[in-house]
Amino acid sequence: MLFRSLAIALATRALENGFSVSYYNVDEWMHQLKQDGAVHPMQLKHRKYMASNLLVLDEFGYQSMSREEANLFFRVVSYRYQKGSTIITTNKGIGSWPGVLAGDEVLAGAILDRLLHSATVLNIQGRSYRLKDLESSLANQSQAADKSRGIPLEESRASC
C-alpha cells in the first residue's frame, strides 16, 4: 500500500506541474498491450502509455509474464527509454525479475538496463501495513473479549 500511495503522490505532483500521467495495474495494462501487440511500435507512440510524461505501473510481478508479455513489456520500456519517466511498484527484488519476465535473464537484463539508467530506486523494507493493521485489530478484539469475560488486562497480557 505504501508503494502505491507514494506512486500516486508522485503522479499527483506531476499532474499539478503540468505533466501528463498514465496509471495502470500491470495485469490490466497487459491486456491492452496484447491488443496492441501486432501494431508497429512507431504507430503506438500516441497511445497513452507511450506518450505520457509519466507512466505508473502498479503491482509489477504479482503474476509472472509469458514470453509474449515480457517481449511487449520490453517494447514499451525500450520505446520510452529517455523519453518519459516510469514508476514501477513491486514487491519483487531486482534479482527476481528474470523469473517474472518468463525466466529470460537476457531480456530482464535489457529491461533493467533501460529502467535503471538514471533511475532512483526506493527499496522500502518492513512489515506489511495491511498485516500490521490486521494484527492490531486482532489484538483489540482479543482485549475486548477478555474484558467482556472479566479478565483483567494485565492477566490477559501475561498469558500472551
Predicted regions and their residues:
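Short, small-residue-biased leader/transition segments that mark boundaries at the very start
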Residues: M1-L2
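Post-Walker A helix-loop "phosphate-sensing" segment adjacent to the P-loop in P-loop NTPases
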Residues: A11-Y24, K34
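Walker B motif beta-strand of ABC-family P-loop ATPases
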Residues: L54
